[in-house]
C-alpha cells in the first residue's frame, strides 16, 4: 500500500509541475472565415470553433460538396507579462492540410485531418503587440494523405479546438506530436507489485522538438 501511495504521489507531482509551468489560452471564438486563396476583410464571416464549411453541402451523402482552400484569421495580443515566455499554438484537428501564418509569415504546415499538431510561435509573436494569426485549411483531394477514398465525406475545417500554450523556457515539451510529453510504460506486473517506467520529455528553446 505504501508503494502504491508513493507512486500516486509521484504521478500527481509530475502533473502538478506540468500544469503550473504552462498557461492554456483558448482561441475558439472570434475567427473570420472565407473561401478562396486570399484572406481579405471583405466577404469574411464570423465563426467560432469547432467549425466546418461543409455543414450544409456535405450532409446526407451529397458528393458535390466544396473541397478546396479556406482561410481562418483572428487577432492575437498577449499580455506584456508573457514577454520572455515561449508561445505554442495547438490545433486539435484541421482537415486535411493546414498552413499556419503569423502576420503573413509562414510558420508550419501540417498534413492529416485526424491528428492534433503544435507549432511554436515564440519567434513570431511579441507580447503586448497585436498580431494576426491565419490558418489556411485545404480539404481538396490528394493522393498522398489518407483517406484517399471512402464511403464518407471529408468535412473541411478547424473541427476541434485551438489554443495557445504559454510556458517557461524549459518546459515539458508540448510540441512532440502534440502529446502531453509524459509517457508511462508498464514494465512488470506480478501479484506482488507493478512497475511503471515514467518518461518526461523536456524542451528548451535551444533543443525544441517538432512534430
State where each predicted segment sits.
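Short beta-strand segments of immunoglobulin-like
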Residues: 182-191
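Accessory carbohydrate-binding/adhesion or oligomerization-edge regions at the termini
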Residues: 20-59, 132, 136, 142, ...
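Bacterial N-terminal signal peptides
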Residues: 7-16
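Accessory beta-strand-rich segments of carbohydrate-active enzymes
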Residues: 34-36, 67-175, 179-181, 205
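A short, compositionally biased
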Residues: 26-29, 94, 209-210
Amino acid at each position: 500500500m505504501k508503494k502504491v501511495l508513493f507512486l500516486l504521489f509521484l504521478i500527481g507531482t509530475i502533473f502538478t509541475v506540468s500544469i503550473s509551468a504552462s498557461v492554456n489560452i483558448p482561441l475558439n471564438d472570434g475567427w473570420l472565415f472565407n473561401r478562396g486563396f486570399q484572406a481579405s476583410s471583405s466577404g469574411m464571416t464570423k465563426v467560432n470553433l469547432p467549425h466546418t464549411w461543409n455543414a450544409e453541402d456535405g450532409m446526407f451523402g451529397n458528393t458535390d460538396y466544396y473541397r478546396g482552400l479556406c482561410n481562418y484569421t483572428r487577432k492575437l495580443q498577449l499580455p506584456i507579462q508573457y514577454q520572455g515566455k515561449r508561445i505554442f499554438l495547438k490545433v486539435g484537428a484541421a482537415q486535411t492540410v493546414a498552413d499556419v501564418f503569423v502576420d503573413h509569415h509562414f510558420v508550419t504546415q501540417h498534413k492529416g485531418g485526424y491528428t492534433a499538431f503544435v507549432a511554436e510561435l515564440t519567434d513570431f509573436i511579441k507580447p503586448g503587440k497585436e498580431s494576426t494569426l491565419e490558418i489556411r485549411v485545404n480539404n481538396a483531394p490528394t493522393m498522398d494523405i489518407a483517406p484517399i477514398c471512402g464511403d464518407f465525406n471529408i468535412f473541411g475545417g478547424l473541427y476541434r479546438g485551438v489554443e495557445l500554450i504559454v510556458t517557461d523556457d524549459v518546459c515539458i515539451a508540448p510540441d512532440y506530436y502534440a502529446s502531453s510529453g509524459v509517457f508511462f510504460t508498464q514494465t512488470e506486473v506480478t501479484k506482488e507489485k507493478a512497475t511503471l517506467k515514467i518518461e518526461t520529455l523536456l524542451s528548451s528553446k535551444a533543443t525544441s522538438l517538432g512534430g
